[in-house]
């Protein structure tokens, strides 16, 4: 058996829904202080040790070190477990009132009970969310997970019924400047952190909602500049600017990256790399290793 490194930006990531239907929660999700507080309130070391046996690496949802675009500050942004700093950020928003159980209260008086939607397909997600639930309780936030079928899950997110959801991180964690940075800007409804803004772009302003955040508007502009760019240097600068904005604004909350994928190889199967990248985009999993060149060694067998 071989252990190949996955190329996801984060094995599991949280997606605050900036287009949530609930006005109070939508306002919070669009406040960078709230997103940063949630990120600081996650004990990633605990998650890595308990769920991934210490084999992963604590990280935001960003590109991996194998990419020439990687910068250490992207990985480290708002990832240090710091309950004091997280609580200070929540206080600065004005969320200072608490109920008898110690839960913070929303401006309308409701307790801060944050429901995270899942597709119900992964016990790994459930285990990670249980650990996050414990650390967020120290922030005065009660977190609950709501599993459902994938189709229902997506409809809830796209319609704004979901406050937050969980999925894997960036699908391409090892990009080059010539690969599309579309995952970093609202370009499709499929993006769980801003489905209505993505739909607006995807449907050429005929559906969804126009982005209101200046940084998000800049991301869309940068993506268009990348599409029209004829210079490799310019494309690299655009990529780095988009990565910087995403790291600072914490539109998605990464947890652990560099998780390992077991690859079972028959003893007499030859030409399979001992070390590899397990990734759909780029790579098509085994595709980039040319499986047509794998062969079975039958020497000495009858």
PLM ranges: what are they?
Residues 25-30, 70:
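Primarily short, surface-exposed interaction patches in extracytoplasmic proteins
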Residues 111-120, 143-146:
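Short, well-ordered beta-strand elements
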Residues 21-26, 142-145, 224-228:
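Short, well-ordered beta-strand elements within core beta-sheets of diverse protein domains
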Residues 4-17, 37-78, 84-88, 124-134, ...:
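Detector for C-terminal structural segments
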Residues 145-155:
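Short helix-initiation/N-cap motifs at beta->coil->alpha
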Residues 32, 80-87, 91-115:
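Immediate post-signal peptide segment of exported/extracytoplasmic ligand-binding proteins
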Residues 132-142:
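Short alpha-helix C-terminal cap/hinge motif
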